[in-house]
């Protein structure tokens, strides 16, 4: 293994009081790297950090790495697919998604929809669909129940576009985008604006339209899969949870609030792909900063494995020729607002304003045409780089992984939308823009077909559709797809768990006490008991549920590594690997996310669970109303109980 020249990645803004000594340190470390023993190099660095901390020099290592790809070229795995066909398919998806939204808004201007989001995310979706997202296989093997995929909601048109090429949707269905009520009259399926299981119960699994709900839900679903495995109810060890979310969405408190739970539980079955197109509806996500660097620091500090996917393969040659670190230094001085401007402008502008900053950069661009500069891809648009990132994430052990993918919002929309401030709200394109889009992606459409927004589908016997379907067969079948059938569980007779309440004989009893007694009896039932999931948010003692700690235990992925202070008590605080109670701490959002994961288990995992989430009434709908709505959208089955309200 050749040692990389790390000198060009060093902070060139720092003042070096002794360059000769610095050179000696650099040389020693580079010699260590040259030996090929990366583990030894990591040990030395860790040891130096410990030494610095002991010396109390008030130094903390920077959690932000250079603005380049985490995975170097020489560590990229070989791309396993047909690159030309996959690029063509991604172009077709983009076109049909655009045509769907634009046609809907030409017919009814108030329908709305989004073009630019999927234009930026198409390649991220396609690599997942072609190589990683495993569908559920109809057999008795629990390991074949597929991956869970949370889709960026504004990119829903792209998922419909893929389902169209797969033959799951028709031209007529696409023509009724966002027209669920009138579609049946025309013999079509109405396509919901965002992923809505309630409206499309055989298609969408998870509602992600409300920003932040998807991210936190994906974390608690991944943790619930571990819960099922550890309690030996269902083996989920081979399955993954994938989430494709937006960089703007990361500002939602729900997006960030459970990051440490994911790392604490070592959820290496969880992969997030954050589509960093740098723009939200009104403008830049971080115009005066860099959202990728900010998120890297946040996720790394929360204990996640972070993969930066910043630049495409077109940049590899430039980096190889850059012996002075000019590119890395220029990126470090370029904020997202300016990067958005570069996305919106052409190659001539970028040659002058990026590569023209100094002689070193200018030399790197020598010999490149303006068109070649314009076509320099960001990492999230390069299938080879995306595959490398996904492959590394899928094989990482011991941590959840986030891939920070750099893209252009409205990718390929040219002057009509690429990188424009208003692109999120773009619903229509004029004739000139449509023809430009067709040319940009080399689509087999005539001028008239492009202007009329004709949906395009290759011949069934052609290589494109054959390849698309073969790739999905390898991964288990079509996706997304929602299931509703599951094993039936016998419900115990009411006398077996509630006789004390039915025959109360005028004894006074609070409703909370009655519930807790019923719950305790249900947990003892031989048929249903193991499927009951009690959930609390640090309120069990208030509700008189502490006796359940010892009876069924509190779930902990590491068991109990300490002796509880009250070990001799009948109410002793007992944590266990096979514990049944989900104690979520002071997090109503986490508790409802766990409840939803359990309440939809019949559909997601094919195993019916019965969750009870009991909470202070005043912290109920006021705090988690949106999450309850999302649970209803995905047809959750369980019990929510508003208990004590007021003085506690």
Please identify what each model-predicted range represents.
Residues 11, 28-31, 78-86, 104-113, ...:
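Glycine- and acidic
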Residues 76-97, 118, 136, 141, ...:
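Non-catalytic terminal/interface segments that mediate subunit docking, oligomerization
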Residues 168-186, 263-275, 297-304, 629-647:
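A glycine-rich helix N-cap at a beta->alpha junction
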Residues 2-166, 170, 509-525, 536:
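N-terminal amphipathic, basic-rich helices that act as targeting or association modules
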Residues 76-93, 97-107, 114-265, 288-289, ...:
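Cofactor-binding active-site loop characterized by glycine-rich and histidine/acidic residues
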Residues 153-157, 180-181, 242-252, 275-280, ...:
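Acidic, glycine-rich active-site loops and adjacent beta-strand->loop/helix elements
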Residues 31, 113-116, 146-149, 240-242, ...:
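Beta-sheet entry/capping signal
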Residues 276-503:
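Long, well-ordered, tryptophan-enriched scaffold segments
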């Amino acid at each position: 293994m050749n040692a990389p020249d790390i000198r060009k990645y060093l902070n060139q803004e720092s003042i070096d009081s002794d360059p000769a000594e610095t050179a000696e340190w650099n040389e020693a470390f580079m010699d260590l790297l040259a030996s090929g023993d990366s583990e030894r190099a990591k040990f030395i660095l860790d040891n130096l950090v410990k030494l610095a901390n002991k010396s109390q020099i008030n130094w903390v290592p920077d959690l932000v790495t250079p603005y380049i790809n985490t995975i170097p070229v020489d560590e990229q795995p070989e791309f396993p697919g047909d690159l030309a066909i996959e690029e063509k398919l991604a172009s077709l998806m983009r076109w049909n998604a655009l045509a769907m939204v634009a046609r809907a808004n030409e017919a009814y201007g108030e329908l709305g929809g989004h073009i630019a989001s999927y234009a930026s995310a198409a390649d991220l979706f396609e690599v997942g669909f072609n190589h990683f997202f495993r569908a559920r296989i109809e057999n008795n093997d629990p390991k074949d129940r597929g991956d869970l995929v949370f889709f960026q909601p504004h990119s829903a048109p792209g998922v419909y576009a893929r389902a169209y090429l797969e033959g799951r949707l028709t031209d007529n269905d696409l023509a009724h985008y966002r027209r669920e009520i009138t579609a049946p009259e025309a013999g079509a399926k109405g396509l919901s604006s965002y992923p809505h299981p309630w409206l499309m119960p055989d298609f969408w699994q998870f509602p992600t339209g409300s920003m932040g709900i998807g991210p936190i839900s994906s974390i608690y679903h991944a943790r619930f899969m571990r819960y099922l495995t550890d309690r030996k109810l269902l083996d989920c060890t081979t399955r993954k949870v994938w989430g494709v979310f937006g960089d703007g969405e990361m500002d939602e408190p729900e997006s960030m609030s459970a990051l440490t739970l994911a790392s604490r539980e070592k959820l290496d079955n969880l992969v997030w792909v954050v589509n960093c197109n740098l723009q939200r509806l009104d403008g830049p996500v971080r115009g005066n900063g860099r959202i990728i660097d900010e998120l890297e620091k946040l996720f790394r500090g929360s204990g996640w494995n972070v993969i930066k996917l910043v630049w495409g393969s077109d940049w590899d040659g430039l980096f190889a020729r850059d012996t002075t670190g000019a590119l890395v230094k220029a990126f470090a001085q370029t904020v997202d607002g300016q990067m958005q401007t570069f996305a919106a402008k052409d190659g001539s502008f970028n040659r002058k304003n990026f590569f023209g900053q100094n002689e070193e950069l200018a030399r790197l661009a020598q010999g490149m045409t303006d068109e070649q500069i314009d076509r320099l891809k960001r990492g999230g648009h390069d299938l080879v780089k995306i595959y490398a990132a996904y492959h590394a994430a899928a094989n990482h052990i011991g941590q959840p992984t986030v891939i920070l993918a750099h893209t252009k919002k409205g990718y390929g929309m040219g002057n009509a939308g690429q990188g424009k401030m208003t692109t999120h709200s773009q619903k229509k394109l004029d004739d000139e823009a449509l023809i430009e889009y067709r040319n940009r992606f080399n689509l087999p459409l005539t001028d008239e077909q492009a202007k009329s927004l004709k949906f395009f589908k290759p011949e069934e016997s052609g290589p494109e559709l054959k390849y698309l379907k073969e790739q999905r067969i390898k991964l288990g079948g079509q996706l997304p797809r929602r299931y509703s059938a599951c094993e039936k569980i016998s419900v115990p007779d009411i006398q077996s768990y509630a006789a004390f309440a039915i025959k109360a004989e005028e004894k006074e009893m609070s409703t909370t006490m009655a519930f807790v007694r019923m719950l305790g009896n249900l947990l003892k039932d031989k048929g249903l008991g193991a499927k009951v999931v009690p959930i609390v948010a640090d309120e069990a003692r208030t509700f008189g549920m502490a006796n359940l700690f010892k009876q069924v235990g509190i779930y902990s992925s590491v068991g109990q590594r300490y002796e509880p202070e009250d070990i001799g008590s009948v109410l002793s605080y007992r944590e266990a690997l096979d514990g049944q109670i989900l104690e979520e701490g002071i997090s109503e959002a986490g508790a409802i996310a766990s409840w939803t994961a359990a309440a939809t288990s019949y559909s997601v995992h094919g195993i019916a669970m019965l969750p009870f989430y009991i909470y202070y009434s005043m912290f109920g709908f006021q705090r988690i109303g949106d999450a309850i709505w999302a649970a209803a959208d995905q047809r959750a089955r369980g019990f929510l109980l508003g208990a004590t309200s007021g003085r506690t």
